[in-house]
C-alpha cells in the first residue's frame, strides 16, 4: 500500500517565507564576509614603524661602492643619503603635491614625475622646480643593532628653508 504525505505541496506563503529567509541569510553572509577581513590583526611593516637599515659601516660601504647613490628602502618610503658630514633619511614624498619622488641615476638627482621638481642627491634640497622646500627627513638613530630610521610621518624633520643645514645630521660619518 502506498502512503501519501498529506502536506507534500508548498503553498504561496511558505514559498515567500523561504525566499525571504534565504535572501536575509545571503545578505548577512555578504555583510559578514566584507567585515571579517578588517577584523584580522596584521603585522605592521613600512611607513610609520622603525626600520633597521643595517650597520653604519655597511651603509657607508654601500655609498662608497655606488658613488654616493641614494639607497632606497621601499617599505619605509625613504632614501638613505650620504650628506656632507653624515647619513640622513629622506622621505620620498615631494613637498610640492606629495608625489613619490624617484631617484634618477641618469640625472644624478631626485626627479619628481608629477611637476618636474628636482632635488640634490646629498642634501635633498630643491635644485629646480615648483617644490617650495627640501624633502622632509626622518629621524635616524644608531643602536646596537645598527641604524634605525623612525618612519613616522608625524615626526619628520621639516626644513622650511631651501638650503642645507648640518644641524639636521643625527648620525655622523
Could you tell me what each predicted segment is?
Residues 2-26:
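N-terminal secretory signal peptides and thylakoid transit peptides that target proteins
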Residues 6-7, 50, 115:
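Short N-terminal micro-motifs specific to bacterial/archaeal maturation
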Residues 86-128:
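Structured, soluble extracytoplasmic/luminal domains of envelope-associated proteins
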Residues 48, 114, 121, 130-137:
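Short edge beta-strand segments in beta-sheet-rich domains
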Residues 17-104, 137, 141-173:
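N-terminal pre-ligand scaffold of iron-sulfur
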Amino acid at each position: 500500500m502506498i502512503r501519501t504525505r498529506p502536506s507534500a505541496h508548498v503553498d504561496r506563503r511558505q514559498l515567500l517565507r523561504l525566499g525571504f529567509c534565504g535572501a536575509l541569510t545571503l545578505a548577512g553572509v555578504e555583510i559578514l564576509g566584507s567585515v571579517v577581513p578588517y577584523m584580522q590583526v596584521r603585522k605592521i611593516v613600512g611607513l610609520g614603524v622603525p626600520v633597521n637599515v643595517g650597520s653604519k659601516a655597511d651603509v657607508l660601504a654601500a655609498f662608497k661602492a655606488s658613488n654616493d647613490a641614494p639607497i632606497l628602502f621601499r617599505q619605509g618610503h625613504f632614501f638613505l643619503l650620504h650628506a656632507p658630514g653624515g647619513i640622513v633619511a629622506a622621505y620620498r614624498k615631494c613637498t610640492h603635491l606629495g608625489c613619490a619622488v624617484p631617484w634618477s641615476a641618469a640625472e644624478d638627482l631626485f626627479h619628481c614625475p608629477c611637476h618636474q621638481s628636482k632635488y640634490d642627491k646629498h642634501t635633498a634640497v630643491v635644485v629646480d622646480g615648483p617644490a617650495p622646500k627640501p624633502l622632509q627627513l626622518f629621524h635616524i638613530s644608531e643602536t646596537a643593532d645598527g641604524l634605525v630610521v623612525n618612519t613616522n610621518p608625524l615626526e619628520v624633520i621639516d626644513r622650511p628653508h631651501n638650503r642645507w643645514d648640518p644641524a639636521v645630521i643625527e648620525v655622523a660619518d
